[in-house]
């Protein structure tokens, strides 16, 4: 940690920091240097205060458990706001806040918020350093937990201080009282209220996406506004490298709403028969991809430097690479813990003995979950066993295919290909997830999550669709767009497709389609595979027919639902409405 006067930050940053210090009445200020010594010092302070528990050093070296407040366990969409002079700029899917309301929150909750506390200044960069993607930010916080998470998920500290530009994204976070009714996560991408010199404000929360301002707040909500203005894309997408047996490498991005298989696909290993044939996969990003144009193509990078991922359900069968990643140098949030100091969550081998649940209660693993369903692990990208050697490429990697996917029990085939770019945008704009349990609301109820950006687009979603259409016009070599659905079920409720590493069989067909015009059947909704490799899978002819069955009656109902959804959003781009009308005609 550095004293403010020895940090070598530029004068613009120093002036801003001094202003925040004065307003929040911080007792002292330190600039985070990002060193292992700093991490050790802060983690020891958290252990001493009881906020961190040191985990079993033999099984999980340099790893810790953090338990959040019981009311502060997930991103809070209903408490997340876009501040704009006019509500239409935020759009119907965002919560709008007036500039006057921002001023009120700033003065009520941030004035004196650090009284008696240390103010931590975290200089960070998103994207590979010294690249055309690099974007800088500073998060100011009173939370040591936030500091240590940013150690892992960003490039931060000394390595970015010297290159911090005069203009950077300014984020201010205050833990506050954790009062859920006064929790605010505010984004100010356009005009600022007088006296509020910040792009992001977060208060009365200390959880993940609400408090780690580099992540969803900067890398998606603020970045998406800038991307539209500057002509690029900031997307809630994985980024995967696939190498075929001939050594050819192809790069794929994919947008999936929560619980739709994004992390597992990002971390996929080819099944045994493919690996033996020479296929390889390598990760670039599990969560966010920034894409910029070059030579008529999209080139992508991961703006982040680590993982902050959901952990329940993860085991050596479902995601071996995640298990390797979280086995060291990891912060666990809201998992359970065994008496021997090992983290535990649902999906690991069942235990009969008592263990500590996510609230710290020692009990048998029956009844309520031991780990919170949204419990997380934070690990550096360098922990991952199969990282692409182009993860730091200053130019990014060329994107050949874009995947959209949702969780649908019926109707949507295992995979289908868009007829063209605009049709692909229509597919992404209308993707959705079915509720799968009574506790989540009505079973089968559909939540539309366009491009998986519903909670993360920093501006009006109809303008976002328009931006995608315009990007397609500018590209001479557009990625092909596909839709995947791993979750189609049989009549008895069981999943038809085995999923997990077997999803690679779908990737194989997608890669084939990038260079070939055959092995596809035209349907009213897009191209489906004529043949897909199912050798070794326990799938019947009836299963395969059901995986790709086009239910015209069901699709007519889907079109009605999409019409209602478009009416709710309003101002849908003409090109998208044309695709909608063409789809309806093909289905009728």
UniProtKB/Swiss-Prot annotation:
Enzyme Commission numbers on file: 4.1.1.32
Requisite cofactors: Mn(2+)
GO cellular component: cytosol
Amino-acid positions noted as binding substrate in the UniProt annotation, renumbered to this chain: 75, 207-209, 258, 374-376
Residues given in the record as Mn(2+) binding sites: 216, 236, 287
Biological process, per Gene Ontology: cellular response to glucose stimulus; gluconeogenesis; glycerol biosynthetic process from pyruvate; oxaloacetate metabolic process; propionate catabolic process; response to lipid; response to starvation
Cofactor binding, note field: Binds 1 Mn(2+) ion per subunit.
Active site (catalytic residues): 260
Compartments where located: Cytoplasm
Pfam families reported in the protein's UniProt record: PEPCK_GTP (PF00821), PEPCK_N (PF17297)
Chain positions recorded as GTP binding sites: 259-264, 376, 407, 500-503
Protein family membership: Belongs to the phosphoenolpyruvate carboxykinase [GTP] family.
Function: Catalyzes the conversion of oxaloacetate (OAA) to phosphoenolpyruvate (PEP), the rate-limiting step in the metabolic pathway that produces glucose from lactate and other precursors derived from the citric acid cycle.
Protein's recorded name: Phosphoenolpyruvate carboxykinase [GTP]
Source organism: Thermoplasma acidophilum (strain ATCC 25905 / DSM 1728 / JCM 9062 / NBRC 15155 / AMRC-C165)
């Amino acid at each position: 940690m550095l004293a403010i006067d020895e940090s070598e930050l530029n004068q613009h940053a120093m002036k801003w920091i001094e202003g925040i210090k004065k307003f929040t009445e911080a007792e002292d200020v330190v600039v985070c240097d990002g060193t292992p010594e700093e991490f050790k010092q802060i983690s020891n302070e958290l252990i001493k205060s009881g906020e961190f528990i040191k985990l079993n050093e033999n099984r999980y070296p340099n790893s810790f458990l953090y338990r959040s407040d019981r009311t502060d366990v997930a991103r809070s969409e209903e408490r997340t706001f876009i501040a704009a002079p006019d509500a239409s700029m935020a759009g119907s899917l965002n919560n709008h806040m007036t500039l006057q309301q921002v001023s009120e929150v700033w003065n009520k909750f941030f004035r004196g918020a650090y009284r008696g506390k240390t103010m931590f200044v975290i200089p960070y960069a998103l994207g590979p350093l010294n690249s055309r993607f690099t974007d800088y930010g500073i998060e100011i916080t009173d939370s040591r937990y936030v500091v240590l998470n940013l150690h892992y998920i960003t490039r931060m500290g000394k390595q970015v201080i010297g290159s911090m530009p005069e203009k950077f994204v300014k984020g201010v976070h205050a833990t506050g009282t954790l009062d859920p009714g006064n929790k605010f996560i505010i984004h100010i991408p356009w005009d600022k209220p007088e006296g509020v010199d910040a792009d992001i404000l977060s208060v009365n929360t200390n959880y993940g996406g609400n408090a780690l301002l580099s992540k969803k707040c900067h890398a998606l909500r603020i970045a998406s506004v800038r991307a539209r203005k500057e002509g690029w894309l900031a997307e809630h997408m994985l980024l995967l490298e696939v190498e075929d047996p001939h050594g050819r490498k192809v790069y794929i991005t994919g947008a999936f709403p929560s619980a739709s298989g994004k992390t597992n696909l990002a971390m996929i290993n080819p099944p045994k028969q493919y690996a033996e044939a020479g296929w390889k996969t390598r990760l670039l990003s599990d969560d966010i991809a920034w894409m910029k144009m070059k030579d008529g193509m999209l080139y992508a990078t991961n703006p982040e430097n680590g993982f902050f991922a959901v952990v329940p359900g993860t085991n050596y069968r479902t995601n071996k690479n995640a298990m390797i990643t979280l086995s060291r140098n990891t912060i666990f949030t809201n998992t359970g813990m065994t008496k021997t100091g090992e983290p535990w969550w649902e999906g690991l081998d069942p235990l009969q003995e008592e263990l500590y649940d996510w609230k710290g209660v020692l009990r048998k693993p029956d009844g309520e979950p031991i780990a919170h369903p949204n419990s997380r692990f934070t690990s550096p990208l360098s922990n991952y066993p199969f990282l692409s050697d182009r993860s730091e490429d200053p130019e990014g990697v060329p994107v050949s295919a874009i995947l959209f996917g949702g969780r649908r029990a019926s109707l949507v085939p295992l995979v289908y290909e868009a007829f063209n770019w605009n049709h692909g945008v229509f597919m992404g704009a209308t993707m959705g997830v079915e509720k799968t349990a009574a506790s989540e609301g009505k079973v089968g109820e559909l939540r539309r999550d366009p491009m998986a950006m519903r909670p993360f687009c920093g501006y009006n979603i109809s303008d976002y669709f328009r931006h995608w259409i315009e990007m397609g016009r500018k590209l001479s070599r557009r990625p092909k767009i596909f839709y995947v659905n791993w979750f189609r079920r049989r009549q008895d409720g069981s999943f038809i497709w085995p999923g997990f590493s077997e999803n690679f069989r779908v990737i194989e067909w997608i890669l084939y389609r990038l260079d070939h015009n055959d092995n596809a059947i035209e349907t009213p909704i897009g191209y489906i595979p004529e043949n897909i490799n199912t050798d070794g899978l326990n799938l019947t002819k009836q299963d395969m027919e059901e995986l790709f069955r086009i239910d015209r009656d069901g699709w007519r109902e889907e079109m009605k639902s999409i019409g209602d959804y478009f009416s709710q959003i309003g101002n849908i781009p003409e090109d998208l409405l044309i695709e909608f009308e063409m789809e309806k005609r093909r289905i009728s």
